[in-house]
Design a protein with these regions (language model features):
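Contiguous segments within soluble domain cores/interaction surfaces
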Residues: 1-111
């Protein structure tokens, strides 16, 4: 079963990823959160990577989605995955649905 994450369009959203092996915290060389319209789409709608939306803090990777990432999205479901690379090992940690939900206060209303 795929994980469903709900996000109000134009809001800030964060998620934490903890990587452990035998109870020990691990770091990775690369991490990506990639969002597309559907699984067969070539176009990446937005992507986060270490140093650009993903930070290591207190042994956890914090992935941040900012308002500008989803301001122009339609209210519907998109797909995402979280992938890590460490040395020559590549692993997808999570594949899921990003459901963009209705908003009432639009950016132009924030005066």
């Amino acid at each position: 079963m795929k994980r469903v994450r709900k996000l109000t369009r134009g809001d800030t959203f964060s998620l934490e990823v903890e990587i452990t092996e035998n109870g020990e915290y691990q770091t990775v060389d690369k991490m990506f959160l990639t969002v597309k319209e559907n699984y067969s789409a070539d176009e990446v709608l937005f992507q986060k990577k270490i140093g650009d939306g993903i930070e290591l803090k207190d042994n956890k990777y914090l992935i941040s989605i900012y308002p500008e990432d989803t301001n122009d999205f339609e209210y519907k479901q998109y797909v995402y995955d979280i992938e890590i690379i460490k040395g020559n090992i590549k692993k997808t940690l999570e594949v899921g649905i990003l459901r963009i939900c209705d908003e009432v206060t639009f950016a132009v209303d924030e005066v």
